[in-house]
Amino acid sequence: MKSLSILGSTGSIGLSTLDVVRRHPERFSIAALAEGHDVEMLLKQIDEFRPSLVSVRDEASRERLKGMLGDHKPEILCGLEGAAEVAAVDGADMVVSAIVGAAGLVPTVRAIEAGKDIALANKETLVVAGQLVSDLVKKHDVKLLPVDSEHSAIFQSLVGHRTEDIERIILTASGGPFRKTPAEELKNVGPEQALKHPQWSMGAKITIDSATLMNKGLEVIEAHWLFDMPAEKIGVVVHPQSIIHSMVEYIDGCVIAQLGVPDMRAPIAYALAWPERCETGIGKLDLTKVATLTFEEPDMERFPALRLAFDALKAGQTYPAVLNAANEIAVAAFLDKKIGFTDIAGTVDKTMQAHEAWTPITLEEYLQADKWARETARQLIG
């Protein structure tokens, strides 16, 4: 029996994780849950999975939840410190890190320091503080298992192979809803259109990132830290059908890929059960029905966010943290209809140009870069 703590239990990844847990009560149990916005959903999760500890967004949500509890009454904490306590709770073997954005960094670090294995859905943790997190994973001898479908695919495609035999890793991208949209029309795109992803069901922030290709850019940086690959050995190819989730090319010219229907329960289950596998409830892949798999180069002129991410990775230091923070502010502004679609990458670019980078060492220094970028991006947006 593996006991789990879930950071972001009421979000898309959290709900999919609990669906896997629900299917395997003999394999998984829930020690603690942290949510951000949906107290009613958390109440249902408490009744079903009976965690000993939960955390909510703020004190008002804490008091509200306290008055709604049934016969099972877990300890209720709130805020960032509450999420960090959920991450480090005694009795949990693994922490599913699925809080959206850089907010997931501190709780994930706390989990690693507490000796927990990590199922990482929060890519921003590695984007913002990849060197720090990688060092902590080694220091505390914990496992860092990818939940992103692309990184799970690479992880699976690397099994049994030597690092020195890798030619490159290839991340696939759906291309988003605007893959065929002319550049001059992109500036008129609204949130309603951008939130319609052609293949995946995800939260709002990651769906917008997928539309700008920033999500793929963040995944490039994540792949660098997960697999110790330089930027020059990480490629991106647009694959609209989202059947091949990513690939590894080896020095002998062979390419190994992982295929499956696009459903996040598959990579989640792989991370939870690793090195074993478990049933997920997703449909079986029928290649005769898919019939055609197509590929194309990403257009970094129409979607400059991907280029900016490669630039940040190559520049290193605090640039990836600044890229991520500015993007979070810009995406929120776009969803609030304060800026246009093409202004998202524009805001990130201007923030990066204004940044004087340094080499961060401590968690506080990474967070300082994050804070600076958020303030600068807000000023640029006005």
UniProtKB/Swiss-Prot annotation:
Transmembrane segments: none annotated. It is an enzyme of class 1 (oxidoreductase). It comes from Chlorobaculum tepidum (strain ATCC 49652 / DSM 12025 / NBRC 103806 / TLS). This is 1-deoxy-D-xylulose 5-phosphate reductoisomerase. Mn(2+) binds at D148, E150, E219. Its cofactor is Mg(2+); Mn(2+). NADPH binds at T10, G11, S12, I13, G36, N122, E124, G203. The keyword Manganese applies. Belongs to the DXR family. Catalyzes the NADPH-dependent rearrangement and reduction of 1-deoxy-D-xylulose-5-phosphate (DXP) to 2-C-methyl-D-erythritol 4-phosphate (MEP). Its EC number is 1.1.1.267. It catalyses: 2-C-methyl-D-erythritol 4-phosphate + NADP(+) = 1-deoxy-D-xylulose 5-phosphate + NADPH + H(+). GO terms for biological process: isopentenyl diphosphate biosynthetic process, methylerythritol 4-phosphate pathway involved in terpenoid biosynthetic process. 1-deoxy-D-xylulose 5-phosphate binds at K123, S149, E150, S174, H197, S210, N215, K216, E219. Keywords: Isoprene biosynthesis, Manganese, Metal-binding, NADP, Oxidoreductase. Pathway: Isoprenoid biosynthesis; isopentenyl diphosphate biosynthesis via DXP pathway; isopentenyl diphosphate from 1-deoxy-D-xylulose 5-phosphate: step 1/6.
